[in-house]
Amino acid sequence: NNAGEFTIPADGYYTFQFNTTDLKYTLKVYADAVAIAKIYTTVGIIGSSTPGGWDASTKLTGSAFSKHVWSLAGDTAKLKDGEAKFRANDAWDVSWGGTTAFSGGGTGDNIPVAKSKYVVYFNDLDGSYLMIPNQE
């Protein structure tokens, strides 16, 4: 069956949820985006699992389509057993973490990390992250 297209009513940020049980989705305006949509010069990952430890952030690459989506891949995404957090502008006044490996976010906790080479995605609007193990 072809479900057809869904319409985005206006430019902005949205949350998209899909229920795999009943095959229905919801698309809602992300109201907090306007209030917290600060633009950061840099976002990095830091912690005992990163190349720079807790002393230096490993810079993520900003997305070409959104100033709030960041990524990391390749040799700089080789992480070791330990913990990590994301932070803005190489400072601690704005930082994000989570309590779960691989995905989560929006808390101040340290993210548990297992040794692997990863592809990492991070969203600075809500602090969500996705860390995909990518052993080569």
Where do the model's predicted regions map?
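Insoluble glucan recognition modules
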Residues: 1-136
